């Protein structure tokens, strides 16, 4: 576990057990980072994936991500009920658009939270906020629109809401999931996986998938970051966000 977080994570170590060496197999090291929110920590935990076996995907259909990396395939685990876009700027320059399909039939409350924060229908939300934490070969994390550094954010239901379902899994690049501080502590922070992350299953609520612009996700993933807190050295901004027509 990363020493810089060791003091902060005493209370949450029981949530994600450390992976140890198995006889005859390489050691797999975990290091968990987090961000503080109302005396708790919202995080997407870090774990090397070099020795992880691929998670089995439960899919309803398969699509090739438009504008994604060559040969990249996205597995959609549920019906897309709405589409959200993020127009991304890196270092003040346009980097392109990410389009996310949301699984409203599977996790309606979680999707409604994300969709409302994306459209700004309540007067606050993701537009103008930043991806505050990036870990290569793992995930990019954002959604803190109050502080911009991982210490804030709020849901449309109040500061926190419950884990709706763990039926959907972290099957690969493009999976959208909620960051949390343990059971039933969802707010506004989210992360997008850049690799399969099966150790997050049954701990974080999956509620969508990148269906266009995975190359933009990869641009974000490739940014140089601080060794202290994995924050990108160039600002990675959601310059504009909103909802798209489902058939558009």
Curated annotation (Swiss-Prot):
Instruction: Report the family membership.
Output: Belongs to the cyclophilin-type PPIase family.
Q: How is its activity regulated?
A: Binds cyclosporin A (CsA). CsA mediates some of its effects via an inhibitory action on PPIase.
Protein name, entry field: Peptidyl-prolyl cis-trans isomerase, chloroplastic
Question: InterPro entries attached here?
Answer: Cyclophilin-like_dom_sf (IPR029000), Cyclophilin-type_PPIase_CS (IPR020892), Cyclophilin-type_PPIase_dom (IPR002130)
Any one Pfam family here would be: Pro_isomerase
Q: Where is the PPIase cyclophilin-type domain?
A: 85-243
Tissue specificity, per the record, is: Highly expressed in leaf.
Q: Which reaction does it catalyse?
A: [protein]-peptidylproline (omega=180) = [protein]-peptidylproline (omega=0)
Q: What does this protein do?
A: PPIases accelerate the folding of proteins. It catalyzes the cis-trans isomerization of proline imidic peptide bonds in oligopeptides.
Q: Which segments carry the region annotation Disordered? A: 223-248
Tell me where on the tree of life, at the top rank, the source sits: Eukaryota
Cellular compartments per GO CC: chloroplast stroma
What GO annotations for molecular function exist for this entry? cyclosporin A binding; peptidyl-prolyl cis-trans isomerase activity
Q: Which UniProt keywords apply?
A: Chloroplast, Isomerase, Plastid, Rotamase, Transit peptide
Q: Gene3D superfamilies this protein is in?
A: Cyclophilin-like (2.40.100.10)
Q: PROSITE patterns in the record, alphabetically?
A: CSA_PPIASE_1, CSA_PPIASE_2
Q: Name one GO biological process term.
A: protein folding
Is Transit peptide one of the keywords UniProt gives this record? yes
Report the top EC class in one word: isomerase
Family annotation (PANTHER family) = PEPTIDYL-PROLYL CIS-TRANS ISOMERASE, PEPTIDYL-PROLYL CIS-TRANS ISOMERASE CYP20-3, CHLOROPLASTIC
Major site of localization recorded for this protein: plastid
The scientific name of the source species is Vicia faba (Broad bean)
Q: Might you give the EC number(s) for this enzyme?
A: 5.2.1.8
């Amino acid at each position: 576990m990363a020493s810089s977080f060791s003091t902060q994570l005493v209370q949450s170590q029981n949530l994600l057990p450390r992976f140890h060496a198995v006889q005859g197999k390489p050691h797999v090291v975990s290091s968990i980072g987090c961000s503080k929110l109302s005396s708790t920590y919202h995080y997407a935990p870090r774990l090397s994936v070099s020795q992880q076996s691929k998670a089995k995907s439960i899919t309803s259909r398969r699509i090739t991500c438009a504008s994604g990396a060559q040969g990249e395939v996205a597995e959609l685990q549920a019906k897309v009920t709405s589409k959200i876009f993020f127009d991304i700027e890196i270092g003040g320059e346009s980097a392109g658009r990410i389009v996310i399909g949301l699984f409203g039939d599977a996790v309606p409350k979680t999707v409604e939270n994300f969709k409302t924060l994306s459209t700004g229908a309540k007067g606050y939300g993701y537009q103008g906020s930043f991806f505050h934490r990036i870990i290569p070969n793992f995930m990019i994390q954002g959604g803190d629109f109050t502080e911009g550094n991982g210490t804030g954010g709020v849901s449309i239901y109040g500061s926190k809401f419950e884990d709706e379902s763990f039926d959907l899994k972290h099957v690969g690049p493009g999976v959208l999931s909620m960051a949390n501080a343990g059971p039933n502590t969802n707010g506004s922070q989210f992360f997008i996986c850049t690799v399969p992350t099966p150790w997050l299953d049954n701990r974080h609520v999956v509620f969508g998938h990148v269906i266009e612009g995975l190359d933009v996700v990869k641009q974000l993933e490739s940014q140089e970051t601080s060794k202290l807190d994995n924050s990108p050295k160039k600002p990675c901004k959601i310059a504009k966000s909103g909802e798209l027509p489902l058939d558009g």
